[in-house]
Amino acid sequence: MDLMSALSLGELALSFSRVPLFPVFDLSYFIVSIIYLKYEPGAVELSRRHPVASWLCAMLHCFGSYILADLLLGEPIIDYFSNSSSILLASGVWYLIFFCPLDLFYKCVCFLPVKLIFVAMKEVVRVRKIAVGIHHAHHHYHHGWFIMIATGWVKGSGVALLSNVEQLLRGVWKPETNEILHMSFPTKASLYGAILFTLQQTRWLPVSKASLIFVFTMFMVSCKVFLTATHSHSSPFDILEGYICPVLFGATWGGDHHHDNHGAPHGMGLGTQHSGLPAKAKEELGEGSRKKKTKKAD
């Protein structure tokens, strides 16, 4: 018996899975995606000097997952751009966030209670995209588990996976920020979600798709809203990975996460770096510091 049916939530899950995403949920997805684009250093200056490049970056933030999924499945990568309504809606959001007088629109949507609503609605879209991606890949490759997982993963986190391409459009090159090397919570969650939906699609997970969409959406909404409200870069998976990864791989997955140093107290970064140096290097560093002090004294 399906767990959701036993809890009398089957009808709720089914109704929830049938809620149309356009335009309300898609609008929220576009708003949050372009807000994160504006957070990037130099994004505002780029919009003033090179508005076309800024618009392309915004479209990549909004539709990058579709582009990457089409690329994986050998379909035209510009196919989604035939959806004129979504393109116009995303373009309108981009213009209001970057060019609205006095930044009124940006200030309104960034007001934390309002932003949390948009963040929650964005996660609804993310989970639905993962489920649709799995179904679409299953239609082409009935027994291609890895293809289904990969397609669902990029559907849920394609924007992050294309971050280096988006940086190139802004004239920035930071290979150390590769999302594969430093997975954020949405990227990891999309991967785990893609695995769950693949198991459900291939009948290895005995739950209905509507029930899985409902449960996983509630999980994503709860986690992402909490992380956004607390301005945290941590992941709910960190504790579990801390136990499993040392056993399976001999190290903690994502232990060198690029957010880890952000919370370090001021004045401890240099000492931490020095503590990781060999003894000989420490001596050379100390000798160099003494020479500099001597020169200043002279």
UniProtKB/Swiss-Prot annotation:
Membrane topology: Multi-pass membrane protein
One of the protein's GO biological processes: endoplasmic reticulum organization
Ranges per topology, Cytoplasmic: 40-51, 107-144, 200-209, 256-298
Entry's family note: Belongs to the TMEM38 family.
Disulphide bonds in the chain: none
Molecular function via GO: calcium-activated potassium channel activity; identical protein binding; metal ion binding; potassium channel activity
Classification via Pfam families: TRIC
Subcellular locations according to the entry: Sarcoplasmic reticulum membrane; Nucleus membrane
One CC-aspect GO term: nuclear membrane
Binding locations of Ca(2+): G74
Keywords carried by this UniProt record: Calcium, Ion channel, Ion transport, Membrane, Metal-binding, Nucleus, Potassium, Potassium channel, Potassium transport, Sarcoplasmic reticulum, Transmembrane, Transmembrane helix, Transport
Purpose: Intracellular monovalent cation channel required for maintenance of rapid intracellular calcium release. Acts as a potassium counter-ion channel that functions in synchronization with calcium release from intracellular stores. Opened by a change of voltage within the sarcoplasmic reticulum lumen.
Name of the protein described by the UniProt record: Trimeric intracellular cation channel type A
Binding residues annotated for a 1,2-diacyl-sn-glycero-3-phospho-(1D-myo-inositol-4,5-bisphosphate), in chain numbering: K122, R126
Organism for this UniProt entry: Mus musculus (Mouse)
